[in-house]
């Protein structure tokens, strides 16, 4: 993209979650932007679609499991075939891990976290660069976490996988810079979403107390993605943009 006003295509995985839905609304509201949204759940995708502004660009959807490369390639291919290019990939699909000390967690817990959080991001990069390299342009934004920079007890698989995503963004940034492709990641702190709805108030208060600015919302995060996807960040690659309400500051 040489001009921010040129029409662009944005692909978002994990579009059915709280952050994915907020990102979909954000990019749908930006001018000259067409979207391809993907998620594992049709019901979640339908809910995201229902919340999009009517005045936005075209939107296509496709169900996909990001741990399967063929399914991710199909999402990117849909974007390229329908809109003629892929300018931005937001690799946002991810899972939490069960709570537990390292020795108590099952092998399956580790494998599931790595397949979705790490392999899912790898598959997104693999699929996107296949289209972006011939364009000699593109921005890939991965969803990492402040948990990849700090330690959360009883959440080793999640912390380890998000640390891997941060390093993956750095390596991919170096590998694809000469192809005109930028790769960055966003490291959110804890934000209110559906997964917190059933937590008791004292648990929420304890989590909020670790964030000097308190708990955020998905709406507090979308600006970071919008920036990294835009020409305003054209000299940024390999960065981990922390948006965490000050959690990592102390």
Regions found by a protein language model. Give the residues of each.
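A conserved structural motif in NAD(P)-dependent oxidoreductases
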Residues: 210-221
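Substrate-binding pocket helix/loop in short-chain dehydrogenase/reductase
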Residues: 100-102, 109-111, 196, 207
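Short, small/polar-rich loop/turn modules that mediate ligand/substrate recognition or access, typified
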Residues: 84, 177, 182, 236-238
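Alpha-helical segment proximal to the catalytic Tyr-Lys
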Residues: 130, 174-175
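Active-site helix of classical SDR
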Residues: 125, 161, 169
